[in-house]
Each structure stands twice: as C-alpha cells, then as structure tokens.
Amino acid sequence: MLISKVKRYLGQATCVAFVTIALTACGESEPQTGGAPPDMRRLTVEQYRNVVHDVFGEHIEIASRFEPLIRTDGLFAVGASNALITPSGFEKFYNVARSVAGQVVDEDNRAVLVPCAPVDMARADDACSRQFFAEVGRYLYRRPLSESEMETAVSAANEVADQFDDFYAGIEFGLTGLLVTPSFLFIIDETEADSSSSSGLRLTGYAKAARLSFLLWNSAPDDMLLKAAAAGDLHTDKGVERQVERMIQSHLLARGVRAFFEDFLDLEKFETLEKDTIIYPAYTINAANSAKEQLLRTIVDHTVNQDAPYPEIFTTRSTFIDAQLGRIYRVPVTRPDGGWEAYEFPEDDVRAGILTQMGFLSLFSHPGRSSATLRGKAVRELLLCQKVPDPPGDVDFSLFNDPDAPSRTARERLTAHSTVPSCAGCHKLTDPIGLGFEQFDGIGQFRVAEQGAMIDVSGNLDGNEFGDAKSLAQAMHDSPSVPACLTNQLYSYAAGRAPERDEREFVRYLESEFAESGYSLKVLLRDIATSDAFYAVTQPKNKTEDVRAASLNSKTKQERGS
C-alpha cells in the first residue's frame, strides 16, 4: 500500500530544473571564467547522513548503504555529477527514507521533531501538515517547497492519515516521499535569468547557498544561509563574503574538510581493506578504523584548528593515537580507557607526517606484504596529480616472483622490472618514491630488515634524492607539485567537475593566492567560495536539447522506482 502511494507521489513530483551560477564581480585580480553548463550531483552517503542528522538529530539511524559512486578524475565528488539511480538503487533509497520517516514520527521523537500537534491524532490535520512540510522541506530541498510540491505532500499525507486513522502515519508517508525525490537526492543547479551576466543566467540564491554549504560543511544550508539566499544577499559580494566568513569560523568546517580529504586521499578503500592476520596479528578492523581516523584527525587539526601550512602535514610530528595505534607504533598510551590523545613523535623517530602513519602505509600495500609500487603510485596520483599508466595486460608476473629466490628484498624484486621495457617506464615513476617507505611493513609497523637483509630506503622524488622516510617527507613538503595538486583537486571537488579549459588561469591564480597565504587551507577555501568562478555558468551548448534531456533524465530517475 505505502510503496504504491510513494510511486504515485513520485509521478506527481516536479521535474528537476537546471541550475546556473551568476557572475558577481569579486576582485579585480581574479581571472574571469565562463564556467560550465548547469548540472546536478547525487548526494554522497555522508552528505545524506549529515543532512538528515542536521535536520532531525544525530539519534536518527541510517543503516543502509547506497549505490556506490564512480571515482572520476580522482574524486567521487566529480563522479556524483554523472550518477544515476537504478531500480535497485531506488529501493535502497526508499528503504532508508521509510526508516528515517518512521523514526521521526516515533512516539519518542514526534514531540520534538514535529513542530505542531494535530487537533485529532486519528485524523488528517491540514494546517499541521503544512507547517511540518514547510519547515522540514525547506531544509531537505535547500529551498522552500513550491506550491505544487506542498500540495502533493499535504494531500498524500492527509489521504493516508484518513485511511489509517493516524495523523502521524500520514506525516511518515509524506516525509518518505520527500526523501526519495530528485530535489532531495540531488544537488541541483537551478538558474534564473540575469541580464548582467555574459551567459544571461545565474544560480538562484538557494542554489548558491547549497554550493556553499556542501563545500564548507558537507551538508545542507542552515537557517541563516537560507535567509541570506531569500533576501538576495548571495547575489552581492559582501553578502557572500559575510556568509563564507561565518561558515569558515564554524566548528562545522572541520566536517567539510574531513569530507574533502577522505575523497582526495581515496580513504573509501578502507571499507574493503584486508590483511593476512597470520602475517600481521596486530591488524584488526578496529585498528584499521583508528588508522583512517588518525589521518583525518591529524589533517583537520593541522589545517583547520591550527591553520598551519598545508605542506607541513607531510613533516609534522604531532598527531593523535589511541590504544589500537599504540600497539602498532609501539608507543605508550596514557589514557586508561585507551581513547584518543595527542601525541608527538620524538625528533629521532623515523615517523614524520601523514605518509608514515598506518593509514597511508596499510592502505597502499598488499594483504601480506608492503608495496613500494602501490605507495609510490599513490603519491604520484593522489598527492602530485600525475597519472601513472596501468600495467600492460600481457605482463608475466612470474618473472618477478622467482620461487628459486624467495628471500629477495623488495628493492631486489623491483629491480627486475627495469629489465622489462614494458614495465620499466612506469616503475621508474613509482618505485624510487615507494622504496622510501620500505622500513614500514604492510600495516605500517617499523622494521629495519627484510628477509635478514638491512633495508635500503634511499630514493628519488623528481630529481631530489632522499635517504629515508623523513627526508622523503621533507621532499614532499618542498615540492611545488604538492600544493598545486591540492588546489586543482579542491576546485574540482567544489565544482563537481574538472576545471574547464578557460578556468586553468583561474586555478593558477588560486595556486598563487594559496602560496601568498603561506598555504593556508582556510584561505584557499575562502578564495574559492567567494570567487566568481565558483558560481559561473554557461548556457547549455544546445539549450533546447539539453533542457529536454535534463527533464527526461529526471523523469527517468523517478520512474525507475516504479
């Protein structure tokens, strides 16, 4: 009964509109860009969770997983712009929506989460339903509901309430419907005419608010940002700057920064990380979770709490550990409960920066041994934005796994690649970097020997020779490619796409401003969020066809759930 009504509700939902971003003059030195056509991005699991928790509270449980996004141009945020919802994917969204709505109207929660009480709990209450959907819908849709959207939600809720003699059953049904519409599941670039823009279009104030909030807080706009959008403040430089400054000062910025680095560093891989526990008995799922958390805590503390230079995340000795990591690093944990505490590695310790933490070292290793190739490839691709080609399909790996020489070290094994022309080119890019981490095994435990031989951890990073992991960390700190890569990927993350050709000059401008600030991540975020480029859009290449395609695509996404 309920699912058939939700299908009918979806059929009545308003088709998703296109969005565009307006050009508003920011600074004379900022290069102007044309932007890109309006787009729509599917919420990530974390964004979905954040929005629901911000609206209804963190006690609302979201247990199910959604269809995975495809990592595109090095980011899931870019892949979200190409995401569709399959029939099985819709069922997952529907099941989660129904669970969330049920928790909202539960007897333990309704008094707090439903802003009014019905005159009669056994009947529909039009006024109370309207109040609920107006308040909740404004946050879920990141804008006020249209009159048709309101009528659809209220009518559906009233019908179910009267049918089941239960006002809250109607609210549950109507809320379930809101949570499976494209207007909630997708961040949509809605546009309006703007004669002052070269494209003739600009993002609506609400679309600008959504861009800001998902970049800085990884969630929907709060009340103050929505009010600024309604008042037209986000169409002025000062209005945008005022909101950006407020949001950067908020504790929620840490959540937004965590989300970016989780995507940037491909930490999603932790969900499928496996290790041979016979070889590594210290490895557990809890240790892996702590390793991921340590990476993110270190980065957020350094770049947000301390506002320290970004390149120093590769050399800092300050971090956080818990009992799980204490065993891996062989350092004492002072808290009786084994919880998180600040820790600083001594000057004579080989560990320095995030690349010598368990998180990076275990993530880019094989289940039963370390991998200089995987680690070097991760440094090249994730942190330097340099593509390493995949190995040829006809490589005979038996050449490098000689059963008559099982005791060879990693360096000796990898040297064999230099004798095979089809392998040598790529391995020369990765192995001289990754060998610098060979004093750390497949889960990041320190060692000085492998197969009875002392480990040689010397190497080379783009012409800069190093003798150990600490000097490799310093080479990363000093590399101009490191901040350039971060700048490019942060802008791609913010825009949901790789920079357009005419935006390259703007990205170089961001790099220059980033350097001028002493590599402050907060300044880089502020420069992006207050720029013209972040909101600039062009007309679709073929406006009529693109708009029709958008409507059909939206309709298809709705009908796939039927």
Task: Indicate where each model-derived feature is located.
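Short, functional "switch" segments adjacent to catalytic/cofactor/reactive centers
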Residues: 69, 78-134, 438-487
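Bacterial N-terminal signal peptides that target proteins for export
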Residues: 2-15
